């Protein structure tokens, strides 16, 4: 059981690293603002965050608006999901890719650091606030017959 839990934790940590990589190069654009929604499901955090980032992690210098993708991370039931819209101007669901990032999720909490007010916030409106300076992601998982496990990751957004 310990080996399986260790393997699960490694998978979750690598998933969180991908999320951190995408969030760290997040962009602000009229094509899509940062948006963070504070949610609950079964009394536990079920937040959602939507943002623009560079497709395939291209260098910031070469990024054109057409290379940006819209990403949404959200908890639905016991799943952590990632939605990607590669065509920002596409109107059909065909331009949306859905990926299951984690199972047995009991909570997904996102906090946003506003560098202008020096406050941590539970929700984010990019139309008013722009891009958050930093974020805290908390993913709570419950494996079979195990205690609730919380994995936390900090990320600086828009870092050079």
Regions found by a protein language model. Give the residues of each.
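Extracytoplasmic beta-strand-rich oligomerization domains located immediately C-terminal to a leader/signal peptide
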Residues: 1-91
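A broad, low-specificity signal marking well-ordered, structured residues that form hydrophobic/aromatic
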Residues: 49-50, 99, 135
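A short, polar/proline- and glycine-enriched secondary-structure boundary/capping micro-motif
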Residues: 61-62, 90-99, 121
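Well-ordered beta-strand positions in beta-sheet-rich domains
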Residues: 70-72, 98-99, 150-154
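Short linear sequence signals and composition-biased patches located at protein termini or domain-edge surfaces
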Residues: 106-160
């Amino acid at each position: 059981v310990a080996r399986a839990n260790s393997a699960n934790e490694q998978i979750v940590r690598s998933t969180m690293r991908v999320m951190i990589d995408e969030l760290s190069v997040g962009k602000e654009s009229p094509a899509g603002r940062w948006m963070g929604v504070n949610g609950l499901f079964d009394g536990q955090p079920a937040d959602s965050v939507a943002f623009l980032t560079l497709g395939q992690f291209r260098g910031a210098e070469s990024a054109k608006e057409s290379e940006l993708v819209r990403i949404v991370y959200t908890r639905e039931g016991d799943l952590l999901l990632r939605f990607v819209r590669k065509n920002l101007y596409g109107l059909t669901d065909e331009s949306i890719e859905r990926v299951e990032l984690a199972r047995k999720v009991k909570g997904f909490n996102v906090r946003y650091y506003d560098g202008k007010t020096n406050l941590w916030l539970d929700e984010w409106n990019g139309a008013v606030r722009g891009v958050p300076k930093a974020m805290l992601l908390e993913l709570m998982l419950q494996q079979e017959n195990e205690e609730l496990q919380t994995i936390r990751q900090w990320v600086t957004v828009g870092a050079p």
